[in-house]
Amino acid sequence: MARTSPPPPVCLALQGGGSHGAFQWGVLDRLLEAEALDFRAVTCASAGAMNAAALITGLEAGGFDGARKTLDKLWREINLSGGKNVFGDSAIWNAAFSPSWMKDTPLWRSAESLAMTMSPYQFNPFNLNPLRRVLDTVVDYEAVQRSDIRMFVATTAVRKGRVRLFENAELTQDVLLASGCLPHLFQAVELDGEPYWDGGYLANPPLWPLFYASTPDDILLLPLNP
């Protein structure tokens, strides 16, 4: 049921956590269905960054209902990509996107062994990533770039060992892939000639941008890791 009064403005903080990002989808879907909150800014990392990009894409295209549809499409596409990935049904991909109980199985252990003995530069020399197709299908980068909803995406600068934030105007597919780049699975993503890894290593998610930006005081944090 639609609200009779404007929803309160808030900032959203979306933590990364691989396939656990689907939990955020569920929470966001319920909030959007209730038209409960007016999202003015989103700070995010890794899977949270992909949720954020889908959220803003949908809000810009069709409001609350549009955001629900876009998030639904994101996770359905991710689910489909799991069976059509660069590694096929190999252990390393399936283990990375499987529930925690998988860690005690031979599948997970073989994936760990592979990750310790080979780098993605060896087992994935062409740097193929099924998430590229998913993001191309779901995210409208131009819509996010011009949106009034501020977005802060965390990445890890490999050589400097520091976090780097990207905002709306800088958002590209490579920025999202860098924010979710696990170095045991994928080659580092090059941005402006510098290699980047998953932003969750140093800021999961970064909260300080919200302290200094002209954003609402209230922050809704959706954690994926305790």
Predicted regions and their residues:
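Small-residue-rich anion-binding loops in enzyme active sites
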Residues: 1-13, 149-150, 158-159
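Cofactor-binding loop segments of dinucleotide-utilizing enzymes, especially the Rossmann-like FAD-
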Residues: 224-226
